[in-house]
């Protein structure tokens, strides 16, 4: 225990005089404590005699005894961290009220040590520990500041404490101390601010306390820990749309600083800077700004690094950036396609695969040149190779990508040649609505405007695999789902309108298909009788499924249902059946 109990012995001179002035109970406590210290390895200082002896010193009016008690608590708790009760915490909280900086420093240290334990964190706050800790944070003594902020940092890791800390008045002094010249205080303060960013309400309190400009200014700090805490805190703050708008209007240097940190020698700083950019890129303005700030060369390098969390952060970021049409060509020119295709082999990370496919889908959405580049990079072949054996989430993304690609007439010949129909048909058996619907939409679009040059691909897949296009049409006609019925009817109509004798014969001569069409027509006819006239309407609507999405913090996938495209599915179904029957004669 050494120095922490220096006043317990007979120091001679003033010390001897002090000892003569001690009360009887204090002398007894000192004597008992010295004996306990001699056998410290066998003593539980948090109960019975040892705790009573320490408490006696705490309540003494003698400052030397208070210091000894505080130092003893600090050293004991450093070596023995476990759940304690109110009887242990109460004397430490009393010491926290002292005006003596040495007592304050040691008491804050002891409380911070005990605040490593979850139960202790809750009890310290319940017993009113925040108020004296906030006072000590504002001390002029650096050591007291450091220990007080460190304790708050530990307390803020407990979810139940966070809102209490946010409302306690602690955020303003924490923000001020984040600018301290002492690196220990800076680390503790920025760490505490980070711990306060895990809920929307607390993030708003933090923004209101003026923490954002301080966090942004500290991104250029030379200390990797401070950089990490600040980038992570800003990343969490950027989860909220209202905060992103505020950042856009008040922090013009933020994106440039984060882009610079993607080159940090610290992988965790790199990762958090990239995640912060990913969250900012939930907004279209930031999607463009990140590219203008030179973010693409950094991101494309990170996609091929060996640190999986960093790869995940980078591919999630580029997924959001790729949503903006102005960025599509720039991303392809920056060399992203091959790394993105390579990430599809990341079989131990569904998230990486999903983000990679979604990015490829975004890039293919609007440009023939981009789609051609996508094909040349091997994206379609790789997706086709993997789609039947990847997890459902990845399968959903790939099927959505297929649906987008199949919309493009310029790409259809290449898709036929890749034998993509061989995987689309099995995917239409999926019990997952998105996978089934996306795959059916892709298959339907491949069946539209079939040229004589490519009719053989339809004929070859008419009955295979898995009963082929024929089986797909029957299943969807009999599905009972208006969406799936519509896809089947639309596909049949497109095949007939291709005016290919062989394909038309396959439909006209198939009694099951004809029966399915007539049954749907009959079931809708009575309902729709009053809504249709003497002539039928025509439709050139493609079957689409666009599920480009922005994701923030957590990885989510959104998709648009085909059913939402039609104001009245029943009218649409009836009209389709009438058009088909008219062609069939």
Curated annotation (Swiss-Prot):
One of its GO terms (biological process) is establishment of organelle localization. SMART domains: ARM. It comes from the Eukaryota. Keywords: Lipoprotein, Membrane, Myristate, Palmitate, Repeat, Vacuole. Its main location: membrane. ARM repeats lie at residues 39-76, 77-116, 118-157, 159-198, 200-239, 243-282, 284-323, 325-365, 409-448. Pfam families: Arm. InterPro entries: ARM-like (IPR011989), ARM-type_fold (IPR016024), Armadillo (IPR000225), Vac8 (IPR045156). GO terms for cellular component: extracellular vesicle; fungal-type vacuole; fungal-type vacuole membrane; membrane raft; Myo2p-Vac17p-Vac8p transport complex; nuclear membrane; nucleus-vacuole junction; phagophore assembly site. It is a lipid-anchor. PROSITE patterns: ARM_REPEAT (PS50176). Residues 531-565 are annotated as: Disordered. A lipid is attached at residues 4-5, 7 (S-palmitoyl cysteine). GO terms for molecular function: identical protein binding; protein-membrane adaptor activity. A lipid is attached at residue 2 (N-myristoyl glycine). It is found in: Vacuole membrane. Residues 531-562 have a biased composition (Low complexity). Functions in both vacuole inheritance and protein targeting from the cytoplasm to vacuole. Vacuole inheritance has a role in the regulation of hyphal cell division. Belongs to the beta-catenin family. This is Vacuolar protein 8. It comes from Candida albicans (strain SC5314 / ATCC MYA-2876) (Yeast). The lineage of its organism: Eukaryota, Fungi, Dikarya, Ascomycota, Saccharomycotina.
């Amino acid at each position: 225990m050494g120095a922490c109990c220096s006043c317990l012995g007979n120091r001679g001179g003033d010390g001897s005089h002090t000892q003569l002035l001690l009360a009887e109970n204090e002398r007894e406590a000192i004597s008992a404590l010295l004996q306990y210290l001699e056998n410290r390895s066998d003593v539980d200082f948090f109960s019975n005699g040892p705790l009573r002896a320490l408490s006696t010193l705490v309540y003494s009016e003698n400052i030397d005894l208070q210091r000894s008690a505080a130092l003893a608590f600090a050293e004991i708790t450093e070596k023995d961290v476990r759940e304690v009760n109110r009887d242990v915490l109460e004397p430490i909280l009393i010491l926290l009220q002292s005006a003596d900086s040495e007592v304050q420093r040691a008491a804050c240290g002891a409380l911070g040590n005990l605040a490593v334990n979850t139960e202790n964190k809750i009890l310290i706050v319940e017993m009113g520990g925040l108020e004296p800790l906030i006072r000590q944070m504002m001390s002029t003594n650096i050591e007291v500041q450091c220990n007080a902020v460190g304790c708050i940092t530990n307390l803020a890791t407990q979810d139940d404490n966070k809102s209490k800390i946010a409302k306690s008045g602690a955020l303003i002094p924490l923000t001020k101390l984040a600018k301290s010249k002492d690196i220990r205080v800076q680390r503790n303060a920025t760490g505490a601010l980070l711990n306060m960013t895990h809920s929307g309400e607390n993030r708003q309190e933090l923004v209101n306390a003026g923490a954002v400009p301080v966090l942004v200014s500290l991104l250029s700090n030379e200390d990797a820990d401070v950089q990490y805490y600040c980038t992570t805190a800003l990343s969490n703050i950027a989860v909220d749309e209202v905060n992103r708008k505020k950042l856009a209007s008040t922090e013009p240097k933020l994106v440039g600083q984060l882009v610079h940190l993607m080159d940090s020698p610290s992988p965790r700083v790199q990762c958090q800077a990239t995640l912060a950019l990913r969250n900012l890129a939930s907004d279209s303005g930031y999607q463009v700004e990140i590219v203008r700030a030179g973010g693409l060369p950094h991101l494309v390098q990170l996609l091929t690094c060996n640190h999986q969390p960093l790869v995940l952060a980078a591919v999630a970021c580029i997924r959001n950036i790729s949503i903006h049409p102005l960025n599509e060509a720039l991303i392809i020119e920056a060399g992203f396609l091959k790394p993105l295709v390579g990430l599809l082999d990341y079989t131990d990370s569904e998230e990486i695969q999903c983000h990679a496919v979604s990015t490829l889908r975004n890039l293919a959405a609007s440009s023939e040149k981009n789609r051609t580049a996508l094909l040349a990079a091997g994206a379609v072949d790789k997706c086709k190779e993997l789609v039947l054996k990847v997890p459902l989430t990845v399968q959903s993304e790939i099927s959505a990508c297929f649906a987008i690609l199949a919309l493009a007439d310029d790409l259809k010949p290449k898709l036929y040649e890749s034998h993509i129909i061989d995987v689309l048909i099995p995917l239409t058996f999926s019990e997952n609505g998105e996978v089934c619907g996306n795959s059916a939409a892709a298959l339907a679009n491949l069946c539209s405007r079939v040229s004589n040059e490519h009719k053989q691909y339809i004929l070859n897949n008419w009955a295979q695999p898995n009963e082929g296009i024929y089986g797909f049409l029957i299943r969807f006609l009999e599905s009972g789902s208006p969406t799936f019925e519509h896809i089947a009817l639309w596909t049949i109509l497109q095949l007939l309108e291709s005016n290919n004798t062989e394909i038309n014969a396959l439909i006209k001569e198939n009694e099951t298909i004809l029966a399915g069409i007539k049954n749907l027509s009959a079931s809708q006819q009575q309902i729709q009788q009053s809504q249709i006239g003497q002539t039928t309407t025509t439709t050139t609507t493609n079957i689409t499924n666009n599920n480009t999405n922005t994701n923030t913090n957590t990885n989510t996938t959104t998709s648009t249902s085909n059913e939402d495209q039609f104001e009245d599915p029943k009218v649409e179904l009836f009209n389709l059946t009438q058009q088909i029957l008219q062609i069939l004669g």
